[in-house]
A protein has these predicted regions:
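Alpha-helical transmembrane segments and terminal signal-anchor/GPI-anchor hydrophobic tails
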Residues: 6, 222-239
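Transmembrane alpha-helical segments and their boundary/interface "anchor" motifs
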Residues: 65-73, 86-123, 130-147, 151-156
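Interfacial loop-to-helix transition and helix-capping segments at the boundaries
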Residues: 60-74, 137-152, 191-209, 223-225, ...
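Hydrophobic transmembrane alpha-helices
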Residues: 81-88, 156, 160-164, 209-218
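Short, Lys/Arg-rich, polar N-terminal cytosolic tail immediately upstream
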Residues: 1-21
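Functionally critical transmembrane alpha-helices in membrane proteins and complexes, commonly lining
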Residues: 20-86, 108-116
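Aromatic-anchored segments of alpha-helical transmembrane domains
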Residues: 34-38, 178-192, 232-239
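Membrane-interface helix-boundary motifs at transmembrane edges
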Residues: 18-19, 91-100, 163-172, 216-228
Length: 239
């Protein structure tokens, strides 16, 4: 019961103006990402050995579920909203960029380091117990792959002040610019065979979705449902 008591205390200390719906969406999206990645990482015994597998490959009928559990846009929209709130607060306090960035990154990186250290210990124990390297590699990937989006999000946090200034000055045109860059990247990738350029779409697409968080903060998109429609449109236009 202590955890619920602690949660109640934290809720009581939360400022009235804080958007709790944003906190709810962040928690739900992260939980779905983690659980979803764990569920698709399947393993089975073959010839007496544990063999790594992938649910979407071994059971193709489950692939349609990925359309239902597309929650990453929600996470990045919420990230944009939260970064806007944080940047506004920093501006009121006269906080420098380095101080602001250190605070934001500490909240992201500290828990990740704890996870990495804990899993390193688990992997070491598995090795000492004679577990096959392939199994250690598979379980490590299954345990840590849900953190992939943090690498992208950390880059967005670093770029957030510049992206927010672009939003304040150009509004939805800034979002359109990122979508256009994503489309041009795809054209270069498929038409000109510039494969190395394809990786940049991790930034352009999610920067565009992140801008929607700024729009939400400014009340420019109306209801959250409309926000998700915008997000879906961005994802479709920039595959």
């Amino acid at each position: 019961m202590r955890i619920w008591s602690r949660a109640a205390d934290l809720a009581a200390q939360t400022p009235a103006e804080r958007n709790r719906y944003v906190d709810f969406l962040r928690a739900v999206s992260i939980m779905i990402v983690v659980v979803g990645h764990w569920l698709i990482a399947t393993a089975y015994y073959q010839d007496g050995a544990l063999t790594p597998g992938h649910l979407l490959k071994s059971e193709p009928g489950t692939q349609w579920l990925t359309w239902i559990f597309q929650v990453m846009p929600i996470f990045f929209i919420v990230g944009g909203y939260s970064n806007a709130v944080s940047l506004e607060s920093a501006a009121r306090k006269g906080e420098r960029y380095a101080t602001w960035l250190a605070g934001r990154l500490n909240r992201l990186v500290a828990p990740l380091l704890i996870l990495l250290l804990a899993w390193s210990g688990i992997a070491l124990v598995m090795h000492l117990l004679g577990t096959r390297p392939g199994v250690i590699q598979f379980t490590s990937k299954a345990a840590l792959i849900p953190t992939w989006f943090l690498a992208i999000y950390i880059m967005l946090v670093i770029l957030a002040p510049a992206a927010y200034r672009a939003w304040r000055r150009y509004g939805f045109a800034s979002l359109g610019a990122f979508v256009a860059l994503a489309v041009l990247t795809d054209i270069a990738f498929f038409a000109a065979d510039l494969r190395w350029l394809g990786w940049s779409n991790y930034f352009w697409v999610w920067l565009a979705v992140h801008q929607l968080g700024f729009a939400w903060r400014d009340g420019r998109v109306g209801s959250p449902a409309l926000l998700l429609v915008f997000s879906a449109a961005v994802r479709i236009m920039s595959p």
